[in-house]
Amino acid sequence: CSSDLIRPLSSGIPDTIGAFASCIDADMEGLYEQDPYKHLLVQTLSDRLAEAATEKMHEYVRKEAWGYAKDESLSMPDLLVEKYQGIRPAVGYPSLPDQSINFLLDELLDMKQIGITLTENGAMYPHASVCGLMFAHPAAEYFSVGKIGEDQLEDYARRRGKSTEEMRKFLAA
């Protein structure tokens, strides 16, 4: 559970959680529309560039901003398999499946400043966009929320102040 990766307020020990958003210019989506192969290449490259920007930002946070890994020196293979401390789950992925989190992150980060807009369902535009959270906890590992039971969905919706049906839409549960 993501909340296990942050110290409780009652501990009296400060802790930090990061929020991030990254995207590639929306104009990239219109390139080579008449050539499906080149268009697919541009889309794929755009997705990878958005992820790479996020990876670089996460490295900066680990080494400089939060400084908990100042001496980190990973080889490219180790970097690619994420042999560093901390995780950065992205919204919509198994560790953070609730698409409505995008609206909270948008309120916090004002993502339109970098060109990201949200649909009514919380999907991001341009498609080559990613946002999520950063955790520095030494034991943090990616996990999958898994199948959400009806009782869990009802409890989560109640705690989020939303209807069960609304949360079902955002969780695709």
List the model feature ranges, each with a label.
Residues 8, 59-158, 164-165, 169-172:
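Compositionally biased, low-complexity/repeat regions
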Residues 10-70:
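ATP-dependent carboxylate/acyl-activation modules
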Residues 43, 47, 51, 150, ...:
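Electropositive phosphate-/nucleotide-binding environments in soluble metabolic enzymes
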